[in-house]
Amino acid sequence: MFLMNILCLVIPILLAMAFLTLVERKILGYMQLRKGPNIVGPYGLLQPIADAIKLFIKEPLRPLTSSKLMFTLAPTLAFTLALSLWIPMPMPHPLINLNLGVLFILALSSLAVYSILWSGWASNSKYALIGALRAVAQTISYEVTLAIILLSIMMMNGSFTLSTLTTTQEHMWLIFPLWPLAMMWFISTLAETNRAPFDLTEGESELVSGFNVEYAAGPFALFFMAEYTNIIMMNALTTTLFLGAFHNPLFPELFTVNFITKTLILTMMFLWVRASYPRFRYDQLMHLLWKSFLPLTLALCMFHVSMPALSAGVPPHM
């Protein structure tokens, strides 16, 4: 029975991830005044399936001087972690209702750094190594602000359980009282998922494709799938944290529809940002975090910690 639950969670995520690749190509196409994929199937709808078949039947080549174990382990770890991050997500019921769901998500997203580091180092290529080092520095840096923002939200929520956020936001979405944090959170999720304008790891002009430059076929597809699964997961988390999904006991099915719609809109914003902005320079990326976001989030976190003490109230303060 539990295996069935896991399959019911994983299969829709994989389908959503597959069609997100198509949506991205379509949206970028229309923004650049062209059609995008429109040959495979009606309106190009079967393109992701064709891509998957093509990638998984190709021979997975490996550089002669690479570390065999780490080279194959890294993409598997990346994809496993990307799927595991969904375990505590309330949609409306999580797979496992964890007391410390927020800490679980933070811990697993930190572990994802290892897969990037291993893939860059095991490839034995200078492009892959530089790309991996950049990705690790970027991910670790932005996780600091993500953790502080999450702490502020948990102060408003009163617990580390994600499921209670729905109750907290019954009367008002947390995006209204926490809008500076929400903006910084959204930008940090862009950096955390290595998306434009923060895709320094795969600067085509200098690093070819970044840490996955030596990968081909199946292992490359796993990295690709992990990236897009993480994008949907981050947007689902943003929806849960700031745009508390509609909760009505009379129409429980509306919760999921509402949740999916908000996640989709946020994902479209990711794609819109990608189509609109040029890439940041590496030093600008680090300055933005350490000199702008970190002091601001720390100040706001102190403010949210002091609120219960001042008002002598118990969270949620809504």
From Swiss-Prot:
Subcellular location: Mitochondrion inner membrane
Keywords annotated in UniProt: Electron transport, Membrane, Mitochondrion, Mitochondrion inner membrane, NAD, Respiratory chain, Translocase, Transmembrane, Transmembrane helix, Transport, Ubiquinone
Catalyses which reaction(s): a ubiquinone + NADH + 5 H(+)(in) = a ubiquinol + NAD(+) + 4 H(+)(out)
One GO term of the biological process aspect: mitochondrial respiratory chain complex I assembly
Quaternary structure and partners: Core subunit of respiratory chain NADH dehydrogenase (Complex I) which is composed of 45 different subunits.
Listed HAMAP family: NDH1_NuoH
Name recorded for this polypeptide: NADH-ubiquinone oxidoreductase chain 1
Native organism: Euphractus sexcinctus (Six-banded armadillo)
